[in-house]
Amino acid sequence: MPVAEIKNATQQPSSTNRVQAYAKLEFEKFSFFVQTLQVTMGRKASNSSDCDVHLGDTKAISRQHAKIFYSFPNQRFEISVMGKNGAFVDGEFVERGKSVPLRSGTRVQIGQISFSFLLPEGSEEDGHLKETGITPLSLQQGKIAYSDEFGGKPTGSFHTVTSNQEKDLLFSHIKHESDLPLGLSPADTNISNATSIIEHPDAANAHTLASLNQPPKHLTVSPSSIQRLSPQPYVRPTSDERPIETDSSVSAPKVANHDEELKQGKSTSPSDTVLHPDLNGSPDTGDATQKPNLSYANLIARTLIANPNKKMTLGDICEWIANNWSYYRHQPPAWHNSIRHNLSLNKAFIRIPRRQNEPGKGSFWMLDPSYIDQFEGNFFRRTKKPTPSATPAAHPDTARENELAAIQTKGISAGKTEQLNPQKETSRSKTHTSRGENVEDRPQSLLQNGIQPIIMRDGKLALNPEFFKNANGEQQAPNEQAVQAISLLQQHINKQLGPAAANNPEQATAIANALAVALAQKLQKQQTQMQGPQQVQQQAKRRKAYTSQQLNPAPTAMPHPNITSPSPSISVTQRPAVNVGPPPYVRPSAPSKLPDTRQSIGDPLPPGAMANVSAGPSSVRSSSYNSTASESKSEITSHQNLHTIPINKPFTSDRPLYSSPNDTLERVETGNQGQRMNSIGNASSFSKRDIMENENGSFDTNAKNGNNVDDSSSVRGMNLPSNSSDALRGVKRPLDETSSSYT
């Protein structure tokens, strides 16, 4: 393939112009020639230009993010990462402060910008400049001038190297007048001090290949007047005197194949590698207007699996998705929130915080190895715990794995909650039973005793048998379900995390510890549920009794302020409570004659009105009306709650002898000389005299001869009206007026 050499623009336009470069950085829409031993790349600053290659204004890219330099001790080009977000080199993540070698065809991705590092054909086999005959001394002899499209300034004049081996490093490209963009003329393209060449996409089309036999017109294109165009493969020149024709049958198919790959949307980015055999190959960029038929969870899973470290931050995940699926690249950043929600809510993704001294911001996210098989196809396939009847007997391993996955899924959230709130375990460590005994409910914490759930045994991860004694120890009979779950967890760790432990033992141990803690908490919860029904029932009964007692308190005997205690000199026998009617009346025997000749009511007291009054001489004590009324009031008031009548005073009338609770006590009218009390109901006043008890226990009366009571003697000492009939009205009645109610 004939190639033209381009010389410096300071020479005559008729002569050929040459551009000397050590390597080329091939971007998506432009190319940059490395003409110095060190090139810096980073974000374009608004005030100054601190880097040689500007990668855009994205905040994810640092101002000086990476540096490509030639290592003299190793005699090779290397890239050193200086940005906090790192870079991807051939799909492998390179952290800040590390350097990796570069070979011809190495793919580098920084943020959303990716490019290829290319060397001349003479050094493509091993990627070392030593094989091309260039020594470190010859590299330091000349001042290399360079300029880039984004505003780089020339640093020196062109220096011609006469060594034939160094001429092999020249990158010469065909620039025809008909291949230039519209509106450009040969005169506009001749600008001095322009040493950076940007390729045109139509440089190797069919028209150019057909006209290679004609002497071409060589032009120098300025970076300020050329557009951002797609890169084309370079051709190594073999002479500096004239163009050398090459076999077009060899180069033409290579160019055609490259064009077909660009049309089909294929890329040489790290996404071309196979992510996982179950994920149906590498992702396809597809059309920018058509959304990929993949769920967000599946996109995240593919991203994490493609990363060699198997962990990425949220920003790196979104950036990787945008670089590999053109639809999300041209969409507003609102879909980043969907990625964040899927990472937080989906149990298949595990959050790993940064170390204390680790640079960068944000936590890392990784995919749980036990969920890799659930991302087959285009969507996240959720598995549920199968029932025993639905589990096929021909596949016991699959049933055990599904059961273990269900137990782990339910226990992860509980494990996080218990680790965040360890005080709740301490408060629930002991419960009080109905018998007053203290029973251990559950251990205070799983890791407080220093027992690690996962230990290394013969270079393999294994469960610590001491860790599960709380759930299946000597305190109770072995639980078959717990033993089976623990054995399934051991099988899962050996099968899924065993290979990962060889590469990253710390990460595999952390995942195994999380699974063991979740299983232990699940078993403890089931153990508490089995032991607690009877205890919970007893606690509910006690709680119900306490609530009813608080709502309906028992009535207490409260003394009334107007009720006075009875006098200690009077002993009153309380009548027992009887629900039936009064007993039949039995007339007592004839009373014996008392020394007193006064007459009283002949009808004795009914049963129930009993009193113990000492016998003595019958005499009427003289007292004023006020003192008699006050004494009667106090005695009646003190006995009204007993429903009995005090009988220490003789009756002077035939009033009803039973007093019911419905009888009302009339208030005492207050006069100038004291209180005055009315009788109960229609009861009349009675005099103050003694009652003598005979030998038979009956009361002595003077009515056995049928004589009436003398008015003057019965009401002796009391101020009564002059009319005796008024004084005795309601107080005394003849025995034959009404018959007794007890006969």
Swiss-Prot record:
Q: Which UniProt keywords apply?
A: Activator, Cell cycle, Cell division, DNA-binding, Mitosis, Nucleus, Septation, Transcription, Transcription regulation
- SUPFAM superfamilies, sorted: SMAD/FHA domain, Winged helix' DNA-binding domain
Occurrences of domain FHA (ranges): 39-94
Q: Provide ranges: composition bias, Low complexity.
A: 529-539, 614-624
Please list where the region (Disordered) is annotated.
214-291, 411-450, 529-743
Instruction: Give GO MF terms, alphabetically.
Output: DNA-binding transcription activator activity, RNA polymerase II-specific; RNA polymerase II cis-regulatory region sequence-specific DNA binding; sequence-specific DNA binding
Give a Gene Ontology cellular component term annotated to this protein.
Answer: nucleus
Any one Gene Ontology biological process term? positive regulation of ribosomal protein gene transcription by RNA polymerase II
**Pfam families on file:** FHA (PF00498), Forkhead (PF00250)
Q: Where is the composition biased (Basic and acidic residues)?
A: 434-443
Query: Where is this chain's protein located in or outside the cell?
Result: Nucleus
Major localization class? nucleus
Locate the compositionally biased regions of type Polar residues. Answer: 221-230, 562-576, 625-643, 670-686, 695-726
Observed phenotype of the null mutant: Decreases cell population growth rate and increases cell-length; elongated cells are occasionally multiseptate. Resistance to methyl methanesulfonate.
- Please name every pair of cysteines joined by a disulfide bond in this record: none
Which InterPro entries has this protein been placed in? FHA_dom, Fhl1/FHA1, Fork_head_dom, SMAD_FHA_dom_sf, WH-like_DNA-bd_sf, WH_DNA-bd_sf
List the residue ranges forming a coiled coil, or say none: none
The UniProt annotation gives the DNA-binding region as 291-385
Stated role: Acts as a transcriptional activator for ribosomal protein genes (RPG) that contain a HomolE UAS (upstream activating sequence) in addition to a HomolD promoter element; HomolD plays the role of a TATA box in RPG promoters that do not contain a canonical TATA sequence. Binds to HomolE elements with consensus sequence 3'-ACCCTACCCT-5' (or its inverted form AGGGTAGGGT).
- According to UniProt, the name of this protein is Fork head transcription factor 1
Species of the source: Schizosaccharomyces pombe (strain 972 / ATCC 24843) (Fission yeast)
In the UniProt record, the gene name given for this protein reads fhl1
